Amino acid sequence: MSSPLYKIFCCSYLNPLSDTRCEWIRVGAIVFKRTAKGYRIHAHGPQKDILNQYIRKRSVEIISKPNLTLCPGFFDTHFHWVQDEVRLMPKENLLDWLQDYTWPYEAKFIDKKFSQKKAKDFAKELLQVGTLGGAVYASIHTHSVDHALKYFVGDYVVGNVLMTMNSPEYLIQSEREALKSIEKLSSKYGERYAM
């Protein structure tokens, strides 16, 4: 059985109007239309109006979620996914936090299996809180960029931190290593890679 052409979610929803305002449609409906790239929002409005317009069309699935409020996905414009487990550690000052927590934790990402598992876990966390895109930093290890771009669902630009100075010996890169990493990842990912 093929997927319906239209899926209509009957629910409340938040509709952003600008960067400072949104409207809350309490008894609304959002119409998703099937495309070659999956379902995309096709129309939205008051539930009564939408149902009157689409109910007679062929290939419609109505999904009633009266106690649900849908909202758009979130975009986080700057985060270091490889610092997730230390982000809540005490931060009296940045340098102590980096030395005591962040750098030792990021060093663990040299292990590809560790990096892959953490990327899968963090991808689940992103979806659970509704984050569907953003600008992300990985560790100095190129595979941490690979893992983020493989597992994160949505529109992400990922870059790795470049640590050629003022870092612990176990995380320092030579300028040559950093340039090699940039060339490899930018060639592989194009616009999805950030420097």
Region locations from a protein language model:
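N-terminal metal-binding scaffold of metallo-dependent hydrolase/deaminase domains
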Residues: 1-56
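A cross-domain feature marking catalytic cores of carbohydrate-active enzymes
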Residues: 79, 137-138, 158-162
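Active-site gating loops and adjacent loop-to-helix segments of metal-dependent hydrolytic enzymes
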Residues: 85-115, 166-167
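Short, acidic/polar
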Residues: 112-124, 144-145, 174-179
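Hydrophobic pocket-lining residues that define ligand/cofactor binding sites across diverse proteins
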Residues: 126-127, 152
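Short acidic/polar active-site loop segments enriched in Thr and Asp
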Residues: 132-133
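Metal-coordinating catalytic core of metallo-dependent amide/deamination hydrolases
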Residues: 143-195
